[in-house]
């Protein structure tokens, strides 16, 4: 989730290998309008040091692929996840809220290029707080487009924005440059743990897009 044009769909594509922007109107306007979906597998390499030991691949990948860093085969599947790419534009707030209802955790993107918080940054964060969502990671995106001082100032603004809320990790990244994506994967594994499921209960489906 996050403000419009802060890099949500780009990060989703980097993590999953799938472009969540599917519809013609989205491609023309370069914004997410409907909820986007993509699946991915997160792996750990037993031979590489953290955080380089974390990597992700498409959902169709084998459960023990070679490590892209060391090319070794001592890898382990840690998570098989689904990502919901929510629109950031104010006009599609209702669509975003329907996506939040199905989430086990939240990845909030904030662009280092702009002051924090932007309008939809605030609205989206308030929405996940209203649902009682506690598993939150913040990605400070686009750090490749600002100076080190600008990135530090923006980081401090983010910290002030979430002040008083414990256990929220802020990870500086550049989605388009694939910078610090391994840290994002590490925090996804450690922060957004799978909820307990009653596999003997009757199945229940939540329809969030038709």
Curated annotation (Swiss-Prot):
InterPro entries referenced in this protein's UniProt entry, alphabetically: eIF2G (IPR050543), P-loop_NTPase (IPR027417), T_Tr_GTP-bd_dom (IPR000795)
Gene Ontology process terms (BP): cytoplasmic translational initiation; formation of translation preinitiation complex
Keyword tags: Cytoplasm, GTP-binding, Hydrolase, Initiation factor, Nucleotide-binding, Protein biosynthesis
Region (G5): 174-176
Pfam family membership, one: GTP_EFTU
Catalytic reaction annotation: GTP + H2O = GDP + phosphate + H(+)
Domain of life: Eukaryota
Residues covered by region (G3): 85-88
Molecular function per GO: GTP binding; GTPase activity; methionyl-initiator methionine tRNA binding; translation initiation factor activity
Family: Belongs to the TRAFAC class translation factor GTPase superfamily. Classic translation factor GTPase family. EIF2G subfamily.
Protein name: Eukaryotic translation initiation factor 2 subunit gamma
């Amino acid at each position: 989730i996050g403000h419009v044009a802060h890099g949500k769909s780009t990060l989703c594509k980097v993590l999953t290998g799938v472009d969540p922007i599917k519809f013609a109107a989205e491609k023309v306007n370069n914004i997410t309008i409907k909820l986007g979906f993509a699946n991915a597998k997160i792996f750990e390499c037993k031979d590489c040091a953290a955080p380089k030991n974390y990597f992700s691949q498409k959902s169709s990948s084998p459960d023990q692929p070679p490590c892209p860093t060391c090319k070794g085969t001592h890898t382990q599947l840690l998570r098989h996840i689904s990502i919901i790419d929510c629109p950031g534009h104010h006009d599609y707030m209702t669509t975003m809220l329907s996506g939040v209802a199905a989430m086990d955790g939240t990845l909030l993107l904030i662009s280092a290029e702009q002051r924090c918080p932007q309008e939809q940054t605030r609205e989206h964060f308030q929405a996940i707080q209203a649902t009682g969502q506690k598993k939150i990671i913040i990605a400070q995106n686009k750090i490749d487009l600002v100076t080190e001082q600008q990135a530090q100032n923006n980081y401090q603004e983010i910290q002030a924005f979430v002040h008083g809320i414990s256990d929220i990790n802020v990870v500086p990244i550049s989605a388009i440059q694939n910078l610090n994506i391994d840290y994002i994967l590490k925090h996804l594994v450690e922060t957004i743990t799978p909820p307990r499921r009653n596999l003997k209960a009757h199945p229940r489906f939540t329809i969030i897009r038709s």
